[in-house]
Amino acid sequence: MNIQVFSGDICSKTAGLSPHNDIRVELFLAGCKMAREGHPCPGCFNSPLWDSKGGRSQDISEVIQYIEKMTDNRYITIVGGEPLDQYPEVVELTKRLKEEKFHIVLFTHYTMSEVIQSYAQVLKHIDMLIDGKFDMEKRIFDTDLRPGILHVVGSSNQKIWFNYSGEFVDVTDCYDLRPFYEGGGEHKRINL
């Protein structure tokens, strides 16, 4: 199975958390149907990724080999465009990455309820979901940051969902993820 990849890079800070100084592989997938239909997220900075034919079509096995050659760090963030525009391919990619023991963060402009309704299979294979359209009017700047994990979102309307033992927990307002690894935390949970 092939997936349309725009680029891959080693990134820190914006790609999410990792125990390796927050350095993760960031995989950019091509295609955003919403933008191509004339409704991009206002202020989207990834317009080169809107074209579903952009980048290159690659076998998923080759993509995984490429990622493993980049680093022995097993932390990856999948962004776009809109990754879920390639839903069957993303399910297969995340499934195989999870089999290789990767920690996976997926960004999508869909809300968690939309993902559950139309894209639920991908939730079985990811560790965190960042949901919601980027909103330039609610953009978060470095000067706005507070301690915790909020630096991984681009605008304040986006939510961070953590897969805690098969339940997705809204951890957007958390300062520390340790309680979720240890079984605590009193945030909104969504059972799959």
Model region roles, listed by residue range:
Residues 1-53, 184-185, 190:
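N-terminal [4Fe-4S]-dependent radical SAM core
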Residues 159-192:
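Charged phosphate-binding loop/patch that engages nucleotide di/tri-phosphates or the phosphate backbone
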